[in-house]
């Protein structure tokens, strides 16, 4: 189902023609304004996570995202993607101004 990531940053590598990823800008899932992200060659999708939103004092909002099943006319075989989740070093203290 739809969810935000809890980490700092998620980088998503997808094959062209194998869409399904949708985002809902900001933390407002209630608006249901879902936007499809079409994968393209040499493009990396970057999702901001809750941790980076907190560090930025909500200046960089995390977003809800989901993967929907393809419609019959969209199906091009199995969908492959690779995600890289960037998390903070828990041994480091970050101080604000």
What do the predicted segments below correspond to?
Residues 4, 14-97:
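Catalytic core of Fe(II)/2-oxoglutarate
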Residues 1:
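Conserved, non-catalytic sequence blocks in retroelement Pol enzymes and Pol-derived host proteins
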């Amino acid at each position: 189902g739809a969810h935000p990531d809890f980490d700092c940053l998620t980088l998503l590598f997808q094959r062209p023609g194998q869409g399904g990823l949708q985002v809902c800008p900001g933390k407002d899932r209630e608006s249901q304004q879902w936007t499809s992200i079409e994968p393209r060659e040499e493009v990396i999708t970057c999702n901001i996570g809750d941790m980076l939103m907190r560090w930025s004092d909500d200046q960089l909002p995390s977003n809800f995202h989901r993967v929907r099943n393809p419609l019959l006319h969209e199906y091009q075989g199995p969908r492959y993607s690779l995600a890289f989740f960037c998390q903070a070093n828990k041994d480091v203290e970050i101080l604000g101004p």
